[in-house]
Amino acid sequence: MLFLFISGCTREINPILDEMTDVRDNQTYQTVTLGDQTWLAQNLNYETDDSWCFQNDPAYCETYGRLYNWEAAMNACPDGWHLPSDQEWSALIKYLDPLSRPNAVLTESKTAGGLMKTTGTIQDGTGLWAEPNTGATNITKFSVVPGGERVPTPSGMFNLLGQHAFFWTSTEYATNSAGFRTLDYGHSGVTKGTSTTNMTKAYGLSVRCIMD
């Protein structure tokens, strides 16, 4: 059990770890329960149409999981799990940071990202994030890794490995756009994609499934 101090308040963080096996391909994932939610504690790595390994190299999938377009992400989670909604992401972030602002444009929390990111840096050989990996403690055991993105150019362009983690939500903003969350190497916060900042559904982003 861990205690987090935020602006004079004590916040209990009690991650409960377990495992689940995806019977579709027999891959085993660590899971983490935070509050009343249970999440995969690793990026999903189930192969579907319209999903990719970074740079189309299977070795990256082993570490970072696959990048899915939104349509693929909506159906990628195993039975008993689903792609989390914008509201479910906000509930997680509020649990970690009572001062978070779910209706804010862009920065939803200034601190929750650091609690969710894996520690260490590429430069000193201790982690997967570029320096400075601001605020990273991973006390939540959510273990966010910076899997980057796939931009839907004709040949597919891969960006930002080691620098950014992008996660789809199931929440649509428009016919061709949906919400997402971003964590990055230079900040300890969590950024929320909104109706004015969202990516098109054709982008390839990481997926974290949440239990039904």
Segments and roles (model prediction):
Residues M1-L2:
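Sec-dependent signal peptide recognition
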Residues I6-G8:
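C-terminal motif of bacterial Sec signal peptides marking the signal peptidase cleavage site
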Residues R11-D212:
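Conserved positions within compact, well-structured domain cores
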